[in-house]
Each structure stands twice: as C-alpha cells, then as structure tokens.
Amino acid sequence: MGQFLIQGGCQLKGEVTISGAKNAALPILFASLLSKGNVNLTNVPLLKDISTTLELLKELGAEASQDGHEVHINASSVKNYTASYELVRSMRASILALGPLVARFGEADISLPGGCAIGARPVNLHIHGLEQMGAIIKVQNGFIKARVNGRLKGAHLYMDMVSVTGTGNLMMAAALAEGVTTIENAAKEPELVDLANFINGMGGKISGAGTDTLTIEGVESLGDCSYQVQPDRIETGTFLVAGVVSGGKVKCLKTAPHLLTAVLSKLEEAGAAVTTGSDWIEVDMIDRQLKSVNISTAPHPAFPTDMQAQFTVLNTVAPGTGRIKENIFENRFMHVPELQRMGANIILEGNLAICGDPDPLCGAEVMATDLRASASLVIAGLIAEGETIVDEIYHIDRGYEAIENKLIALGAKIKRIEN
C-alpha cells in the first residue's frame, strides 16, 4: 500500500503549483457521458480517482484517455449501462454515473458505492430526485437500477439536505430532461459551478449555479466541448496550512483566492500574513506567533469540511484552546487518535474536537484512514520531532497529485516507500 517516511522539524519555503480540482474533475468526467461528441479537458489532476473513473467510462463503452493533464472522452459509442462493483467499490463518486446514464440512455445499473469511510453519505436524495423526474428505481443485489421510458421529465425538486453529489447528479440528469427542472436547497460549492459551466459548454442551459436554486432547461442532445478544470481549493488550503504550521512562507500558484475566503480568513486569525493576487496566494508565518482558532464546518461558502483535519493539526500546535465542530459528516475525526499517538492534546466530545495547550508533537507510526485525514498526518509529521511513518497512503493518492514532490520542493524531508 505504500508509506511516507517523514523527518520532522522543517520550515517550508517556496512556491507550489496547484493542480486541477479532483472534486470538479470527477463530476465533469461523468457529465461527459451526456455528450454525443468529443470532450477535451485540461488541468485534470493525475490521481487514482481520475484513472479509476476513466476505466469506468471505458467499461461503459466510451473512448477515454489521459495524456498528462489532458483528457479526451468520446461517449458516442456507449452500449453498456452497468457500473460494476469492481470499479465502484473504491470510489463513492461513481454514483455520479447514475444521472447521466438514465438521462441519455434511459437505463442505469450502478453498484452501491464505496470510498472514504467517513459517514453514511446517503444516496436516497439521488434516487428520490430521479423518481420525481419519472425514473423507476429499485435497489437490489447491491445495485441501484434505474429505468425510464423515453426522456426524463422536468420537475420541481427540493433537496431535503444540502448534498453536493446529489445536486450534481440531478443537475446532469435534468440537462437532457424534457422541460424545465428547478432544484431548491441546492449545494453551492464551486465545483458545482464548474460542472454547470462545463454542461453549458456542451450546449446545456443551466442557470443559478452557485446559488441555492438551480434552473435547468432540458435540451435534446449535448455535443463537443473543450474545458479547463478549475484549481483545487482544498489542495491549496492544505499547502497553506502546512506553510503556516511550519513557521514558513509558501506561495500557491495557479489557484483561485475567491474560492477560499473562509479558509484565508481563519489563517489570518491564526496569525498568518496572507497576500493574494488574481491566481496566487501567499502565507508568511516567519517571526509570527501562531494562534488557535475556532472552526465550524458548513456547506459553501462557509468553512469546508475537507479542511477540518488540517486545521486540527494547526490547533494542536497553537497556544490556547481551539474548538473544531464538524457539522457535515459523522465519523470524521478518525485522524484524532493518530494525532494523539504523536502527542496531540485533543479531547473529542461527539462532533466537537477540543484542542488544548500544545505539547510538542513527536514522530510516530500512524495510519491514514481517509483522504483529508491522511493529509493532516503528513502535515503533523513535517513539524513533529523525529521520524514519522504514515501508512496506507493510497488514501492521499486519491486526492493529492505528487504531494511528496511538491513538499520536497518546499524543503520538506519526505520519502515514499513502496511495500
């Protein structure tokens, strides 16, 4: 599975180029199933989840290839509408094949998804929305089986809870539905704005992306599109936190400051000097005093759950008491016991992590349990005394492109060990 061997005590300095956003690229890849033409994407990150998705598209009958950060897809010859357990089990995003397949082909069998073990992430929102649009859906034998005679029909949909994947799936399905669909209480994440812009680039008619009400005027078909995936705001935030807790100075290039308003505000509150340009962000912590901060995760534009683990590390080494409340996912403090093995002073009370006055972190062997937790353990290893080994790093490869190479360029002492 591989390990990272990290020598602690480094101060990160320099520039790092941010990759395309995994959480934008994945739904865009699935949305390419809606098109009868050629789709060319740029700024696609080189990640395990991306290659898994391309394999799934090929299994369905599409042409799909990646050359560096460019991806070409042609789904005109799709003949198979079943997403098998073999590919779906490692990646929850596979549920995003459901909407496009049933919208374009009237049929989809999607194995119930796997992926990060951080909570229920229910699929009932996807199912209920598609049923309101006319699909007949059964869940049996580990599959979601959806059928519709003719085209899906536009409908007025209300999301019982804010769901990024649910909003994305129904947006894609509605793009080829007959009539107008409105989605109320829609998720507002930037990655969904990217998805809507991509679908519109293929000829779709979606308005309201980035607000809580989407209006989708269905079209009969979608065609060619060339599109650049937006930068990864979570990778950006991760490197910024690493720079801050190491007492260094890090500049993230090819990123988008407007996507990180809540995170940048908390970094300033933590004592960092934050400077931004049109496509770059720099944090400077040299000769500055780190401070603990209180965090409460919530849907965009509030503080993102995907940055919670990284700020937990920040609070463990900052003076004072910092409280982190996780409101999005249950079971998303699996990094805490691993940080405690390194000496972190953290008390868990339900969905609240209370980080007390710091003791120095000491290197230890720790296990990555999910994507963002693994990033927090790498950050902790960079600032701990001595040597840290992070096991099960396949989690981090799902969402961070060549993270060790980027950290080494900033002065980190980190090595990948394959076993």
UniProtKB/Swiss-Prot annotation:
Which one Pfam family would you cite for this protein?
A: EPSP_synthase
Active site residues according to the UniProt entry: C116
- Residue numbers carrying 2-(S-cysteinyl)pyruvic acid O-phosphothioketal: C116
The UniProt gene name for this protein comes to murA
- Residues annotated as binding phosphoenolpyruvate: K22, N23
Q: Where, subcellularly, is it found?
A: Cytoplasm
- On the tree of life, the source organism's domain of life is Bacteria
The alphabetized list of GO BP terms reads: cell division; cell wall organization; peptidoglycan biosynthetic process; regulation of cell shape; UDP-N-acetylgalactosamine biosynthetic process
What is the organism of origin for this protein?
Answer: Psychromonas ingrahamii (strain DSM 17664 / CCUG 51855 / 37)
* GO CC annotation: cytoplasm
Biological role stated in the UniProt entry: Cell wall formation. Adds enolpyruvyl to UDP-N-acetylglucosamine.
What this protein catalyses is: phosphoenolpyruvate + UDP-N-acetyl-alpha-D-glucosamine = UDP-N-acetyl-3-O-(1-carboxyvinyl)-alpha-D-glucosamine + phosphate
Q: In its keyword annotation, does this UniProt entry include Mitochondrion?
A: no
What is this protein's record name?
Answer: UDP-N-acetylglucosamine 1-carboxyvinyltransferase
Single GO MF descriptor: UDP-N-acetylglucosamine 1-carboxyvinyltransferase activity
Q: What is the lineage of its organism?
A: Bacteria, Pseudomonadati, Pseudomonadota, Gammaproteobacteria, Alteromonadales
Entry's family note:
Belongs to the EPSP synthase family. MurA subfamily.
The pathway to which it is assigned is: Cell wall biogenesis; peptidoglycan biosynthesis
Q: Major location, coarse class?
A: cytoplasm
